[in-house]
From Swiss-Prot:
It comes from the Bacteria. Its main location: cytoplasm. This is Elongation factor P. Belongs to the elongation factor P family. It is found in: Cytoplasm. InterPro entries: Elong-fact-P_C, NA-bd_OB-fold, Rib_uL2_dom2, Transl_elong_fac_P/YeiP, Transl_elong_KOW-like, Transl_elong_P/YeiP_cen, Transl_elongation_fac_P, Translation_prot_SH3-like_sf. One of its GO terms (biological process) is peptide biosynthetic process. Keywords: Cytoplasm, Elongation factor, Glycoprotein, Protein biosynthesis. GO terms for cellular component: cytoplasm. Involved in peptide bond synthesis. Stimulates efficient translation and peptide-bond synthesis on native or reconstituted 70S ribosomes in vitro. Probably functions indirectly by altering the affinity of the ribosome for aminoacyl-tRNA, thus increasing their reactivity as acceptors for peptidyl transferase. The keyword Membrane does not apply. Glycans are attached at R32. Pathway: Protein biosynthesis; polypeptide chain elongation.
């Protein structure tokens, strides 16, 4: 168990009978009152979010989840199938992938981390950066070069992100999977 003060982003806690990952913490202190810790949480089973507050000394159950490095194998509607180094396969429901679904493509070489709770695969964490090909974007607008000009682009996997104006169809780009932002052309 941890106190609310000790909880950090990335920790997984048990809250209202479900595992939640802490996305953000904010501590406020007032003159005579005890510190208040505000947590932004994401439910790992339902893929929903909430914010809640605790007193600084409140006890919180922290849990350690099993994580395995896996590679994407194939899609069997509605499950994405991942395989570990020992050729064990794990099914992850499409709704549990969240934003990661936009970056998953057949034949991808990146290794993902699959998270387990009670022996069941519940989420997938993509690598921090990935390289994908642009399959559709509008041509650049001539003369529109003042400042940082961005335009929408569709990448392999079906996701849409904002890219720099100079990016063309067929270009390979690096993407930050935590924010979904274009980093550079590769």
């Amino acid at each position: 168990m941890k106190t609310a003060h000790e909880v950090r982003p990335g920790n997984v806690i048990m809250f209202e009978g479900s595992p939640w990952v802490v996305q953000k913490t904010e501590t406020t202190r007032s003159g005579r009152n005890a510190a208040i810790v505000k947590l932004k949480l994401k439910n790992l089973l339902l893929n929903s979010g909430t914010e809640t507050t605790f007193k600084g000394e409140d006890k919180i159950d922290d849990i350690i989840l099993d994580r395995l490095d896996c590679t994407y194998s194939y899609f069997a509607d509605p499950m994405y199938v991942f395989m570990d180094a020992e050729y064990n396969q794990y099914d992850v429901e499409a709704e549990n992938l969240g934003d990661a679904a936009a970056y998953i493509v057949d034949g991808m070489e990146e290794t993902c981390q699959v998270t387990f709770y009670d022996g069941k695969a519940i989420s997938v964490e993509m690598p921090t950066t990935i390289v994908r090909e642009v399959i559709y974007t509008e041509p650049s607008a001539r003369g529109d070069t003042s400042g940082k000009v961005m335009k929408p682009a569709t990448i392999t996997g079906g996701g849409t992100i904002s890219v720099a104006d100079f990016v063309k169809v067929g270009d390979k780009i690096e993407i930050d999977t935590r924010t979904g932002e274009f980093k550079k052309r590769v």
